[in-house]
Curated annotation (Swiss-Prot):
Molecular function as annotated in GO: rRNA binding; structural constituent of ribosome
Name the UniProt record assigns to this protein: Small ribosomal subunit protein bS20
Keyword Oxidoreductase in record: no
Protein keywords: Ribonucleoprotein, Ribosomal protein, RNA-binding, rRNA-binding
Gene symbol of the encoding locus: rpsT
Pfam families per record: Ribosomal_S20p (PF01649)
Length: 88
């Protein structure tokens, strides 16, 4: 339990920021997992799912939830999955 007033304020602000960011990170991760599951199952709408997942990744990057390089890496991996699934 912090005693210094600035520490108390930072703790309160951190809690509020976590409450905002947690659902956003969860939405990003869910979009990626849904695409990976669909690619493994051989779904028909992979191109549409890829565009939605790519948008979710870009949104997470814009809000500084993930770094720029991680966003690029994730999109490259998902694109590789898309190409592998559609070439079959």
């Amino acid at each position: 339990m912090p005693i210094i007033e600035s520490s108390i304020q930072r703790e309160r602000l951190n809690k509020a920021e976590r409450a905002v960011r947690a659902p956003q990170i969860s939405a990003y991760r869910t979009a990626v997992k849904n695409f990976e599951k669909a690619a493994a199952a051989g779904a028909d709408n992979l191109q549409e799912l890829f565009s939605k997942t790519s948008a979710a990744i870009d949104k997470a990057e814009t809000k500084n939830l993930i770094k720029k390089n991680k966003a690029a890496r994730d999109k490259a991996r998902l694109y590789k999955l898309l190409k592998a699934a559609t070439s079959k």
